[in-house]
Amino acid sequence: MRVDADDFARPCSCGREHQIAVKEILIEAGAVEKLEEEMSEGMLREYISPLVICDTNTYAATEELMEDIYDRCQVLVLDAEGLQADRHAIKIVENNMEEDIDLILAVGAGTIHDISRYIAHNYKVPFISVPTAASGDGFVTTVAAMTLDGVKKTVPSVAPICVLSLIHISEP
């Protein structure tokens, strides 16, 4: 199923006009092939130094399926055990990512997305959402749920430019 974000770009009943950063939402079994196509010849072809952020569980579940995408990106696999969207995780990403990243692909669930959107916001690069589990607060939000200085809070971040759901991974 393809959701055209332009369908939502109309005056709201509240009287305000809301901006939508997401250009496309695709939820189907062929989402990986669509992502490969977009990276090769579509709207993502301009990005030459993408970074994939995922955790050990997600990497194991998607390694074969996303092999071609992983081959063309820097892939940063975070340890899933005890992983939190906090300063420690941010520091791990910052210490291990290449300096010239121009796109982030968040492959995983909520914590990976919060880390990715926070990094994308701080480095002013777009990110792609590749959810592998249902979300409690939304993959297209413009805030990240971060634990900073021991306190969980929402901080300004960025919405993805595209959501490509791996439906057979994210099904319960």
Regions found by a protein language model. Give the residues of each.
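Glycine/threonine-rich beta-strand-loop-alpha-helix active-site module
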Residues: 85-165
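Residue-level detector of conserved catalytic or cofactor/ligand-binding positions
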Residues: 164-172
